[in-house]
Amino acid sequence: MSGKSLLLKVILLGDGGVGKSSLMNRYVTNKFDSQAFHTIGVEFLNRDLEVDGRFVTLQIWDTAGQERFKSLRTPFYRGADCCLLTFSVDDRQSFENLGNWQKEFIYYADVKDPEHFPFVVLGNKVDKEDRQVTTEEAQTWCMENGDYPYLETSAKDDTNVTVAFEEAVRQVLAVEEQLEHCMLGHTIDLNSGSKAGSSCC
């Protein structure tokens, strides 16, 4: 891949067993292991991609969802460019815990502007028949908690996996573009000492 690549750090967060490792492995290696064990601590994989003409190296961090691994995973939140809040559509509790994961990330990642931080919500395991969370419920949660993009995925069937990670990149680039626009709008007239342009931040 030619051209300068932008390094983006993306964190997968959610309860243990919702399929975070499977999503990461499906996206990076295009493999699915139905016998995969729970993650202990953190793991990460890289993948290069091009989104809307931008070359990106995506560094995907998969974190252990169990409470006992909290002290191992939280130091790795810092420096994240995007967070993929993940639940399993056949596990109602994992959906109800999304708010806790959101708060944990914002606190430990030391997010300065939570309202504009790029979160993407993934409802995984849509290949399962015994669904406990409807699409409408998940979309409503996303609208009420930050107007986040919502995608339904299946690492097993490779449903929307690539789309999900590309959406994460687009969300980061959109925030970056907005910040650049704001900075350009804050030009200063050196002669009068007054600011020119309007603020969008």
From Swiss-Prot:
Chain sites annotated for binding Mg(2+): 21, 39, 62
KW Lyase (keyword) present: no
InterPro entries per the UniProt record, alphabetical: P-loop_NTPase, Rab9, Small_GTP-bd, Small_GTPase
Protein name, as recorded: Ras-related protein Rab-9B
Family the entry assigns: Belongs to the small GTPase superfamily. Rab family.
Chain's role: The small GTPases Rab are key regulators of intracellular membrane trafficking, from the formation of transport vesicles to their fusion with membranes. Rabs cycle between an inactive GDP-bound form and an active GTP-bound form that is able to recruit to membranes different sets of downstream effectors directly responsible for vesicle formation, movement, tethering and fusion. RAB9B is involved in the transport of proteins between the endosomes and the trans Golgi network.
Binding site for GTP: 18-22, 33-34, 36, 38-39, 65, 124-125, 155-156
UniProt free text on domains: Switch 1, switch 2 and the interswitch regions are characteristic of Rab GTPases and mediate the interactions with Rab downstream effectors. The switch regions undergo conformational changes upon nucleotide binding which drives interaction with specific sets of effector proteins, with most effectors only binding to GTP-bound Rab.
Protein source organism: Homo sapiens
